[in-house]
Amino acid sequence: MQAKKRYFILLSAGSCLALLFYFGGLQFRASRSHSRREEHSGRNGLHHPSPDHFWPRFPDALRPFVPWDQLENEDSSVHISPRQKRDANSSIYKGKKCRMESCFDFTLCKKNGFKVYVYPQQKGEKIAESYQNILAAIEGSRFYTSDPSQACLFVLSLDTLDRDQLSPQYVHNLRSKVQSLHLWNNGRNHLIFNLYSGTWPDYTEDVGFDIGQAMLAKASISTENFRPNFDVSIPLFSKDHPRTGGERGFLKFNTIPPLRKYMLVFKGKRYLTGIGSDTRNALYHVHNGEDVVLLTTCKHGKDWQKHKDSRCDRDNTEYEKYDYREMLHNATFCLVPRGRRLGSFRFLEALQAACVPVMLSNGWELPFSEVINWNQAAVIGDERLLLQIPSTIRSIHQDKILALRQQTQFLWEAYFSSVEKIVLTTLEIIQDRIFKHISRNSLIWNKHPGGLFVLPQYSSYLGDFPYYYANLGLKPPSKFTAVIHAVTPLVSQSQPVLKLLVAAAKSQYCAQIIVLWNCDKPLPAKHRWPATAVPVIVIEGESKVMSSRFLPYDNIITDAVLSLDEDTVLSTTEVDFAFTVWQSFPERIVGYPARSHFWDNSKERWGYTSKWTNDYSMVLTGAAIYHKYYHYLYSHYLPASLKNMVDQLANCEDILMNFLVSAVTKLPPIKVTQKKQYKETMMGQTSRASRWADPDHFAQRQSCMNTFASWFGYMPLIHSQMRLDPVLFKDQVSILRKKYRDIERL
């Protein structure tokens, strides 16, 4: 055996050597013949070898450096590999590689902050209503500037929403019109809005002109063409989508278990051929006519009968049996398959209806995906796994379904219910990219009240806002600052403002008192103010207008603010109790004087009433506690037009603050126990008696209500019948057993 192994090894080694000499000889002969040919051609003057003749030759020589955005403009002398050509042609945008760092000029934003300029409308140019709403939302926002030299971002007045050449809204010659703009600068620092692009039959994402280095806020954009941290994916919305406000979500109360009549529904067009037809043509395989109702119709377009298949008549009959709105209101999940384009109107319809969207649109970059975690509000499916959808959603636990439905309502109302919210969300995302050091985190974007109402310029710490105490495991503040608004001169030591100051200072929760002196008379001398155990700071209002009481003064060192009118009559016990209530509801207004609103059918407008009833929707800031963040929000979020109106009327600032807080929280204020004589005492004071009795004052407040509701786009105030009283309040027990016993004695 050992001898056989040795013979086998020797035979293998010999074979290897033979092969080596054979192939080596071929290469040697080839090189010799090649050298002879070179020598022969050299004698005939046909070849002059270079000094690096003996260096090896590589198939692709190193190319000189060329900036990426100049590759397509170079002549053919610069070699571009086939792979690079494919990459360049794979995108419809020449600025495929654009990112904020490479195609955005940050220096324009450092000087004046984030300001947006809208080009003036050119004469003779038609603008669709949807694009007019977008421009109006920008011009009505706090970001707008009419001075291009102050702008950080530029938006075209040319309508770029519909770039389908078959659409009547299509704007012709857009390429030359855009290039002629003197501020265009190859699209740098420009934002282009687009809902529809491409046309039959392939519906590409080409917008029909060179966008250069401009950002796209685009619906139905694919992940392939989406430029991360540069473009913004927006939802597809209809021309009827409201400009401001918008309807609230359909989830009025939480039903347990959170299941509805239908498990999964869809009702829409079916395309027999072409792009987007595969998924919708296959839906009938999943439809069972019971809890999974997926309805399609071929009955659309001019020539639908010429192209209909064997299922069309049956599908059309079944389609007519069901009401779409009824299905939405009674379904747990709503299928959102792609159409001709990746996006669909069904997406926003499902969100509003609290019907959990089941996405079937492979490659779609979901709206605002940069900041929204869609796994908390939707089920992301795969078109190739359509038949597995029913079993997948049936396996979702009821607790998860309830959480998904609740999140759909939050996202709808925070970012999608109006064109204004879609536009503002787009702008806020871009602003966060520019000022990364104060940008919002994922918790802010995906938790109530959302990114539009939490301004990072106020603070980068979540604990400074009234909405995140529970998330951070923090207790609400234990101290407050009393801010007394003084408008009448100090002529007597018995004036109500001095009694109020002493009562507030005696509170165990009071950290300091600030007197905002908005009186035309000079400041009183320091000895005129009573001595207190807490600091008393007197601030003279520079403008002496009503809105100045809500300025974010640096002197306010506590998160809680006790806002007081100079003629308010409160005891220390009442102040203490109101503050302990506020600690349980730090995001709301908590206080004493309550008012209400109503809809006047005869006048078709909102009405204001001060009648004492069991129903209220406002707590006036003449005696109320709230978080100081609302001072900042009032000053920086609300438009100057509303604040100017308040200042001119010297009225309605308390109503506007209630509008703001209710719009943010989606909750009513909280009324606490009030002494019986409060109304009579307050009305008897000389400083404001004339105001409350003045019919013009009341008419102004009626007018304010409607102006404010018009700007918000809806009525944010919410009615409530809850009043919080101390434990054992009015109970037939000994007064000594009651903590806030003085309230009943008043």
From Swiss-Prot:
PTM comment text: N-glycosylated.
Lumenal compartment residues: 29-746
Subunit: Part of the heparan sulfate polymerase, a dimeric complex composed of EXT1 and EXT2. Could also form homooligomeric complexes. Interacts with NDST1.
UniProt GO MF annotations: glucuronosyl-N-acetylglucosaminyl-proteoglycan 4-alpha-N-acetylglucosaminyltransferase activity; metal ion binding; N-acetylglucosaminyl-proteoglycan 4-beta-glucuronosyltransferase activity
Family assignment from sequence similarity: Belongs to the glycosyltransferase 47 family.
Keyword Phosphoprotein listed: no
Keywords assigned by UniProt, alphabetized: Disulfide bond, Endoplasmic reticulum, Glycoprotein, Glycosyltransferase, Golgi apparatus, Manganese, Membrane, Metal-binding, Signal-anchor, Transferase, Transmembrane, Transmembrane helix
Main localization of the protein described in the UniProt heading: Golgi
Topological domain ranges for the Cytoplasmic compartment: 1-7
Paired cysteines (S-S): C98-C103, C109-C152, C298-C312, C334-C355, C652-C704
Membrane topology note: Single-pass type II membrane protein
Function: Glycosyltransferase forming with EXT2 the heterodimeric heparan sulfate polymerase which catalyzes the elongation of the heparan sulfate glycan backbone. Glycan backbone extension consists in the alternating transfer of (1->4)-beta-D-GlcA and (1->4)-alpha-D-GlcNAc residues from their respective UDP-sugar donors.
Coiled coil, from the record: none
One Pfam family recorded for the sequence: Exostosin_GT47
Listed GO biological process terms: heparan sulfate proteoglycan biosynthetic process; protein glycosylation
Protein name: Exostosin-1
Any Gene Ontology CC annotation: Golgi apparatus
Reactions listed under catalytic activity: 3-O-{alpha-D-GlcNAc-[(1->4)-beta-D-GlcA-(1->4)-alpha-D-GlcNAc](n)-(1->4)-beta-D-GlcA-(1->3)-beta-D-Gal-(1->3)-beta-D-Gal-(1->4)-beta-D-Xyl}-L-seryl-[protein] + UDP-alpha-D-glucuronate = 3-O-{[(1->4)-beta-D-GlcA-(1->4)-alpha-D-GlcNAc](n+1)-(1->4)-beta-D-GlcA-(1->3)-beta-D-Gal-(1->3)-beta-D-Gal-(1->4)-beta-D-Xyl}-L-seryl-[protein] + UDP + H(+)
Residue spans crossing the bilayer: 8-28
Pathway membership: Protein modification; protein glycosylation
SUPFAM superfamilies, per database record: Nucleotide-diphospho-sugar transferases
EC number in record: 2.4.1.225
Known glycosylation sites: N89, N330
The UniProt record lists the keyword Disulfide bond: yes
Class of enzymatic activity (EC top level): transferase
